[in-house]
Swiss-Prot record:
Pathway: Porphyrin-containing compound metabolism; protoporphyrin-IX biosynthesis; 5-aminolevulinate from L-glutamyl-tRNA(Glu): step 1/2. This is Glutamyl-tRNA reductase. During catalysis, the active site Cys acts as a nucleophile attacking the alpha-carbonyl group of tRNA-bound glutamate with the formation of a thioester intermediate between enzyme and glutamate, and the concomitant release of tRNA(Glu). The thioester intermediate is finally reduced by direct hydride transfer from NADPH, to form the product GSA. The record marks 99 as: Important for activity. Keywords: NADP, Oxidoreductase, Porphyrin biosynthesis. It catalyses: (S)-4-amino-5-oxopentanoate + tRNA(Glu) + NADP(+) = L-glutamyl-tRNA(Glu) + NADPH + H(+). Belongs to the glutamyl-tRNA reductase family. Homodimer. Possesses an unusual extended V-shaped dimeric structure with each monomer consisting of three distinct domains arranged along a curved 'spinal' alpha-helix. The N-terminal catalytic domain specifically recognizes the glutamate moiety of the substrate. The second domain is the NADPH-binding domain, and the third C-terminal domain is responsible for dimerization. InterPro entries: 4pyrrol_synth_GluRdtase, 4pyrrol_synth_GluRdtase_dimer, 4pyrrol_synth_GluRdtase_N, GluRdtase_CS, GluRdtase_dimer_dom_sf, GluRdtase_N_sf, NAD(P)-bd_dom_sf, Shikm_DH/Glu-tRNA_Rdtase. Substrate binds at residues 49-52, 109, 114-116, 120.
Length: 448
């Protein structure tokens, strides 16, 4: 069995292409079921987010698995394969496993180390599992991916460092004041950056947030989401009087907070500390205010230094996660290659159990004076002997499954132990495409 992922993401395709391959919440279940019914495909999970659409499949033949997954995309979205093939990313085997582990851990995201994708992968997997499109392989693989991602975030500091200017501004405020719950916070600007800043402040514990904007209705729309207050920017002088922290991010062409505004406020505030963070370009705050007593001014360049430093630190943490991924891949592949010899191991154990039972029956017949306790002790020791005798053969067959001449070794093993297990006449990868349908039914039963 082979694992294949076919998809496109923000690295391989522009948004104009990606938006054509978005699965809605209502259709994604039908899509996974339909994908699983394609030729040579035994399991399927579809991950569809704003930045990626990826189809994960378990297939018995790489070439047919790739082809029918691409054909499924073409048919589902009513497109010609040639239109989107240049934008596709196709990974197989170890690289497919590595890709899933990296995606789930946030290493393939636009913001390295973000955790939103972990929830999206979990949702996609649980949805597929609920509707029966996963089996033995993906049930194991996706659980391993989720467990690995959780461990990666708890064992490293990859998610603890701000890597956006707005989040860095909030981190800076926390470093200065430790707790934000009792601080008066002013956000100037109600655009995308202003709203994100307000969100970050709210999540950091700020409870007294005032949003100022040229259009008061826009300020209200943002403030209402986070239990804040809305004001026109014309009232900024009043905002400066109360503020402990002010973060500004308007799109104005010139400063909206002048030297005189801050100087007057500080005089009335008796020079109480005021943290001003200007994340606008052009700058919103006159840089001369930094000379005023009690004023601490930071601009976007100061924050970019923090962001770049944190990005470098995240990359160091990412290397630690990559090492964990290498270990997880090795463990999973070891499990995967032994999956095919599970019926052989089961047959060997069953044969040994039959011998044990026959021997025990013979002993009981010949030694009819044995008590129930005697029989229990003898049975326990016989089982221990059998388990010890089976250890080396089972280790051998597991190792044999991973060798280049696996089929020869497995055939010799079956013959040596006289097991009643059938091997395919040829490796699955060599089966002709026309034979895939007939082979699918028994293989699918095994994978379930």
């Amino acid at each position: 069995m082979h694992i294949v992922v076919v998809g496109l993401n923000n690295k391989t395709a522009p948004v104009a292409i990606r938006e054509q391959f978005s699965f809605g919440e209502q259709e994604i279940v039908d899509a996974m079921i339909a994908l699983r019914e394609e030729k040579s495909i035994f399991e399927s999970v579809i991950l569809s987010t704003c930045n990626r659409t990826e189809l994960y499949v378990v297939t018995d033949q790489l070439h047919t698995g790739r082809y029918y997954t691409k054909r499924f995309l073409a048919n589902w979205f009513n497109l010609e394969m040639e239109q989107f093939t240049p934008y596709l990313s196709i990974r197989e085997g170890e690289e497919a496993i590595r890709h899933l582990f990296r995606v789930t851990s946030g290493l393939d995201s636009m913001i390295i180390g973000e955790t939103q994708i972990l929830g999206q992968v979990k949702t996609s997997f649980f949805r597929a599992q609920e509707h029966g499109t996963t089996g033995t392989v993906f049930n194991k693989l996706f659980k391993e991916a989720v467990t690995l991602a959780k461990r990666a975030h708890t064992d490293t500091q990859i998610g603890e460092m701000s890597v956006s200017v707005s989040s860095a501004a909030v981190t800076l405020a926390q470093e200065m004041y430790q707790q934000l719950e009792d601080k008066q916070v002013v956000v100037v600007g109600a655009g995308e950056t202003g709203e994100l800043t307000t969100l970050n402040l709210f999540e950091a514990g700020a409870k007294q947030i005032a949003v100022f904007n040229r259009t008061e209705s826009k300020a209200k729309a943002v403030a209402d989401k986070f239990k804040g207050r809305a004001h026109s920017i014309r009232e900024i002088a009043c905002g400066l009087l109360d503020a402990d922290i002010l973060i500004s991010s308007t799109g104005a062409k010139e400063a909206v907070i002048g030297y005189d505004d801050v100087a007057a406020a500080q005089l009335l505030r008796r020079e109480r500390p005021l943290l001003l963070i200007d994340i606008a370009v052009p700058r919103d705050i006159d840089p001369a205010v930094a000379t005023l007593p009690g004023v601490h001014l930071f601009d976007v360049d100061d924050l970019n230094g923090i962001v770049n430093k944190n990005l470098e630190a995240r990359l160091v943490e990412a290397e630690k996660i990559e090492m964990k991924i290498d270990e997880a891949i090795q463990e999973f592949q070891t499990w995967l290659v032994t999956l095919g010899v599970v019926p052989i191991m089961n047959e060997l154990r069953a044969r040994a159990l039959d011998i044990q039972e026959d021997t025990m029956t013979s002993l009981e017949r010949k030694l009819d004076h044995l008590s129930a306790r005697d029989k229990k002790v003898i049975g326990k020791h016989m089982k221990s002997i059998i388990n010890q005798m089976l250890r080396d053969p089972i280790d051998y067959i597991k190792d044999a499954a991973a060798q280049p001449d696996a089929n020869v070794r497995i055939a010799q093993f079956i013959e040596t132990f006289g097991l009643d297990v059938e091997l395919p006449e040829q490796p699955v990868d060599e089966v002709e495409e026309t034979d895939a349908t007939s082979a699918k039914a028994p293989l699918r039963a095994l994978m379930r």
